Amino acid sequence: FITAGAAFIVSFLIATLNHFGGFVAMLLVMCLVAFVIINNNRKFKQKREQDNVDTLFRQLVRSHDKAETWDLLIQHVRRTQGDVLTFTRDTFRNITQGLMHENMKQLRTAAHAIEDEKGIWKRYRRKEIVGMRKIDYLLAVEKNTWFHLGCNSSTQLIYGLKRMLEPCIEHVDNNFKPLPQDYIDELIPLCNDVDKFLEEARRMITTGDFDGADAVSYT
């Protein structure tokens, strides 16, 4: 009954818009529907990725085999660290593009994404600390420093983006003089290098293949 009522109301609104607004109104409605579908699809993809990580965590919590728990924890850390690097790469690109093109909407989107990512990362970190408590004690002592270094690195990436974004928003929002073209020309190759570095770091962490780590560190 509720679904039928909602469908009737939507149909009535669309017919009204078509009657009074004609083709332009219908075009706007179609654009709005397309935006909603794309946005919902993006959110669904993000939720599915988080659910995959949560499934891995549930397996980790249920496991009573310390060797299996360690293997699951490694997989969990690889996924979460890879997710943070993917987020960092995308957000860094949005911030720099927003600054270069004076796009305030793009900068605001990056600001909201950073706040969301802070909450997501805190949940991941708490879960992985639980995992560290379930593995063999001596192994936990051995890996503890490296684990927290990885956590702190991910945290610093997120907060580094926030600190970088703040002056960019201030610059664009206050209508300061746009960046000169020669500054932009100098910035673009640097952005490309950072983008390649983050993608290569993500690939190495998620696959566990660090053969090219030295080459990446010197780029």
Question: Where is each model-derived feature located?
Answer:
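Transmembrane helix-loop junctions at the membrane interface of multipass transporters and ion channels
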Residues: 5-25
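Composition- and surface-driven signal marking solvent-exposed, interaction-prone regions
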Residues: 25-30, 109-110
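Hydrophobic core of alpha-helical transmembrane segments in multi-pass integral membrane proteins
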Residues: 28-39
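Cytosolic, long alpha-helical scaffolding segments
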Residues: 41-218
